[in-house]
């Protein structure tokens, strides 16, 4: 039986002569494994946006090739290897520039501060990668939920102080020849907060975290400034964008602060 010839419309010439900056697939869900700083393999679900630049001479890109790359696997990522899949996309799609954004939930086992009960804490992570010919740029973003306690409320109240959950978001780029781990950013944010969060707390743990937060009050301004001090001093980091959003327990709005620094 002879093969049927099917026209390759997307690979035909385009006469409008306009370059497309980004074209590809957005928000495709795929299972992945993330390898943490200790080498532990953490299975999770990734949401990918994968794009390339498109020449002014070509009508369309090869959409199916993006998904083929994911299906070929292995979809194992770490702080060391995210650039490999970006390079694979650029070469397979025959493009000068490739972009990948990967969102996933990162899980970390934590022990409660008094009882020692272990539970899994979740953090939202985004990896950003761009490869322009042979120049690669990779950044990571992590959202760290913490507790913040108001210094003003503590200073004026007899019986306690209002506190709330806050999200500290750190987007950072590693300096040349340096490795930056997700855990580095999580540890920093939790260390500077009034108190960190846990999935499970027994009564003695709840006493510890309540008192710890009371002993470490912080405005939203304090949170970003304290974290920025360490980010500025960290030679592993060449750029960062730092945000804190406090979901105020006594208001129907959030308090917010941002610091951004292109160090080098």
UniProtKB/Swiss-Prot annotation:
It comes from the Bacteria. Pathway: Cofactor biosynthesis; 7,8-dihydroneopterin triphosphate biosynthesis; 7,8-dihydroneopterin triphosphate from GTP: step 1/1. It holds the Pfam family GCHY-1. Coiled coil: none annotated. HAMAP family: GTP_cyclohydrol_B. Converts GTP to 7,8-dihydroneopterin triphosphate. This is GTP cyclohydrolase FolE2. The gene is folE2.
């Amino acid at each position: 039986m002879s093969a049927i010839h099917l026209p390759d419309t997307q690979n035909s010439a385009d006469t409008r002569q306009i370059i497309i900056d980004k074209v590809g697939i957005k928000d495709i869900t795929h299972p992945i494994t993330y390898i943490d700083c200790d080498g532990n393999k953490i299975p999770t679900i990734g949401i990918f946006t994968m794009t390339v630049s498109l020449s002014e001479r070509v009508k369309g890109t090869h959409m199916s090739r993006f998904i083929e790359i994911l299906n070929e696997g292995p979809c194992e990522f770490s702080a060391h290897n995210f650039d490999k899949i970006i390079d694979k996309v650029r070469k397979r799609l025959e493009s000068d520039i490739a972009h990948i954004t990967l969102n996933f939930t990162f899980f970390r086992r934590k022990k409660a501060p008094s009882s020692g009960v272990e539970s899994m804490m979740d953090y939202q992570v985004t990896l950003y990668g761009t490869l322009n010919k042979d120049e690669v740029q990779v950044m990571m973003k992590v959202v760290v939920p913490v507790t913040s306690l108001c210094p003003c409320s503590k200073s004026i109240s007899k019986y306690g102080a209002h506190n709330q959950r806050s999200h500290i978001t750190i987007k950072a780029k590693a300096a040349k020849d340096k490795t930056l781990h997700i855990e580095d950013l999580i540890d920093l944010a939790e260390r500077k907060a009034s108190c960190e969060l846990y999935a499970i707390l027994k009564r003695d743990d709840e006493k510890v975290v309540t008192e710890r937060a009371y002993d470490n009050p912080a405005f939203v301004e304090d949170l970003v400034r304290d974290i920025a001090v360490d980010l500025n001093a960290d030679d592993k980091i060449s750029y960062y964008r730092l945000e804190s959003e406090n979901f105020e327990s006594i208001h129907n709005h959030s308090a917010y602060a941002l610091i951004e620094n292109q160090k080098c």
